[in-house]
Amino acid sequence: AKKPSVEAVFHAYLLSLPGIKFVGHTHATTVNQILCSPRAQDFAVHRMFPDEIVCCSVASVFVPYTDPGLKLAQTIRSQTEAFVRKYQRQPRGILMKNHGIITLGATWQSLLSAKLMAEKAAKVFVGAAQLGGPEFFTEENIARIAGRPDEAYRQRALKM
């Protein structure tokens, strides 16, 4: 019989979070281009455009490189708990340095929307880097956009 993935522990933990029913883990090419660069944490904790905030939330959890297995699950847990304390919400994305992306949500649509938007944001980030670097939103702009009623309506329409 096949053995379960060494990453099963972090999947189980994430599925135990309030409101989380779906967890997806991929190694999206453009996202990994950034995660394998010195700009990985910048990409995780900053936002560049409104759709990124709507689909990927105000920031993503950033996990420094950790070997897969129990240690990675423990690091994901501690970084996720710190995110929840800081932002008072569950994350929609977890970006793992030199590894990949985890998206999570209450519906499969929210998981897919976050994954696709993270890949779009990665393409924008890489393109902006070629033109002198990305221009990030301020925390005030992020908070304002995240709190707009029309953006909340869009999230409901996207089943987020």
Model regions and ranges:
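Glycine-rich flexible loops
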Residues: 1-160
